[in-house]
Amino acid sequence: MKPFIKAIAGIANQDVERVALLAQVAELAGVEALDVSAHVDCVKTARALFKGTLFASAVSADALLKAIEAGADVAELGNYDDMYENGEFITASEVMALAEASLKALAGKAPLCVTIPGHLSRDVQVEMLHALADKGVAMIQTEGAIRLLKDNRVQALNADEKASLSLENARFLASEGRLPIMVASGISAQNVDLAMQTGAIAVGIGKAFNALDSQKAMRQELEACQVAMNQVLSAIA
């Protein structure tokens, strides 16, 4: 699998006009993949504007199947930011159950990428990696999580802390060599090089891209991410 950048519109972003804008920018920037909400209207809008690999994200097997039927190429389970915002922490068993339901619903129609919750211990994440690989999951995405549960207290993480945690999780999981790893959470042009050095095959760019105000700034961020990735790949070639 060739290393790639994935632009992330956001799992909670169901504003079709905004999704259309982000899809247009991603296409102009030349990134290989775009990730949108599995909401059918968002998927159809993005599919009409973006020629690369289209990921659709949800925390529902039914929503993922509908997204694939609407034109998405890859179903992605996660992320879980909405849950963390509400102080909810999805468990490993809950993710495994959702993954099994998603694989059953998809029935081979499309590959499944699963986000492993960033708040779980490394040992649990590794167990999940192997179990998901055995079940037929195609790719893992790491996250930093916007909140952690520590000593029974909810602890908020800033962007740098999210990125650091996601990078650490990616390095740990990539070293297992079971599945391709994608790094997301707090990743931007400033740390794409660190993301690639973890052994990951792909990098997800979210708020560093989708929270910007102008199309020019969004495109420049994605292009800078690609330049940074290519520099790392050239250095290790």
Report the location of each language-model feature:
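Alpha-helix-loop-beta-strand connector modules within alpha/beta enzyme cores
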Residues: 39-63, 90-114, 157-185, 189, ...
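Active-site beta->alpha loop and helix N-cap motifs at the rims of alpha/beta catalytic domains
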Residues: 16-18, 25-29, 38-39, 52-111, ...
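Catalytic cores of alpha/beta
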Residues: 21-22, 59-73, 120-135, 175-203
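A general structural signal for well-ordered alpha-helical packing
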Residues: 99, 126-129, 137, 170
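Hydrophobic faces of well-ordered beta-strands that scaffold small-molecule active sites
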Residues: 3-9, 34-36, 54-58, 75-77, ...
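Short, small-residue-enriched loops and turns at beta-alpha junctions
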Residues: 11-15, 63-64, 82-87, 118-123, ...
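Glycine-rich phosphate-binding active-site loops on the catalytic face of alpha/beta enzymes
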Residues: 38-40, 72-90, 135-153, 194-222
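Conserved N-terminal beta1-alpha1 strand-loop-helix module at the mouth
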Residues: 1-72, 129-137, 217-230
